[in-house]
Amino acid sequence: MFRIFKMSFAVIIIILALIAFNYTEHTSVIQSVMLVFLGAVMFMQGLEERKKENDGSGAFNIYTAVFVWSVSLIGFTLHII
């Protein structure tokens, strides 16, 4: 079940990447959306590693996901301004 969820996120990221290459005039918005999905996948990987190892591993993926989400929020804000 969890693997299907992760694979669907990967497919969505690939579709968004194809759209970004086809419509280059709108890439600033699409790149921010792709960063949100990338952050979600990294966050889920971090939670999965943390659950498997039962220690501090996976924290790097979670921190990286938060960083990616903050960059995407900055991208959305700059696009709106």
Curated annotation (Swiss-Prot):
**Where does it live in the cell?**
Cell membrane
Keyword Metal-binding (UniProt): no
Membrane topology, as annotated: Multi-pass membrane protein
InterPro entries registered for this protein in UniProt = DUF3953 (IPR025018)
Task: Name the GO cellular-component terms.
Answer: plasma membrane
Main location per the UniProt record = membrane
Alphabetized, the UniProt keywords read: Cell membrane, Membrane, Transmembrane, Transmembrane helix
User: 4Fe-4S as a keyword?
Assistant: no
Q: Where are the transmembrane segments?
A: 4-24, 61-81
Q: Name one Pfam family in it.
A: DUF3953
Name listed for the protein in its UniProt record = Uncharacterized protein YczI
